[in-house]
Amino acid sequence: MYVSIEGIDTAGKSTQLNILEKTFPNAIFTKEPGGTALGIKLRAMALGGEAKSSIAEMFLFLADRAEHIEEVIKPNKNSLVISDRSVVSGIAYANQFEIDKLIELNLIATSNILPTHIILLELTPEELKFRLSQKANDSIELRGIDYLINIQNRMKETIKKLNVNHIFIDASLKIEDIAKTIEDFLNVK
């Protein structure tokens, strides 16, 4: 089973991933971008602003995703693999491009391999504003609430278009309730 935890910054992905590591100690935990040796370099290039063009940046992330599928997902196809982000985030954050075109490119990069289960932690604009006010913000978070809510909406649209098993969870719920919902969704004891 290939599971992806998705959500905009401050949605609680890291918290839920920490809980999942305790709940499923034999699972393989990974992340996109940067889940492989090459991926770490590509991520640094993309996030470090080395690519001056948004198209070049997108292709760096596609290269990372292709490597991630080959190095992590395919060799562990009979295991539980839980990823912090996936193709969904890659498509959503490349918001200057059409979703359908990005899906085509990502299916090439992933050899048509998609997560079997996608969990999206959703925030309302009000909850996002509160969470952002409680921390120092990185460059993406500094783009503002409207930007992040737009990304979240693109995540939802992408998930629906990919037509994979998914669940949208209100990220303002209690941490324990979210964890229980995720565990039930994965239906793995």
From Swiss-Prot:
Q: State which Enzyme Commission number(s) the record gives.
A: 2.7.4.9
User: What does this protein do, in the record's words?
Assistant: Phosphorylation of dTMP to form dTDP in both de novo and salvage pathways of dTTP synthesis.
So where does ATP get bound?
A: G7, I8, D9, T10, A11, G12, K13, S14
UniProt record similarity statement: Belongs to the thymidylate kinase family.
Instruction: Mention one GO biological process in which this protein takes part, according to its record.
Output: dTDP biosynthetic process
Which reaction is this enzyme known to catalyze? dTMP + ATP = dTDP + ADP
Q: Which UniProt keywords apply?
A: ATP-binding, Kinase, Nucleotide biosynthesis, Nucleotide-binding, Transferase
GO CC annotations? cytosol
Could you identify this protein by its name?
Answer: Thymidylate kinase
PANTHER family found in the cross-reference section: THYMIDYLATE KINASE (PTHR10344), UMP-CMP KINASE 2, MITOCHONDRIAL (PTHR10344:SF4)
Q: What InterPro entries does the annotation carry?
A: P-loop_NTPase, Thymidylate_kin-like_dom, Thymidylate_kinase
Q: Which organism is it from?
A: Aliarcobacter butzleri (strain RM4018)
Which Pfam family, an example, fits this chain? Thymidylate_kin
One MF term in the entry's GO annotations: dTMP kinase activity
Residue ranges the record marks as coiled coil = none
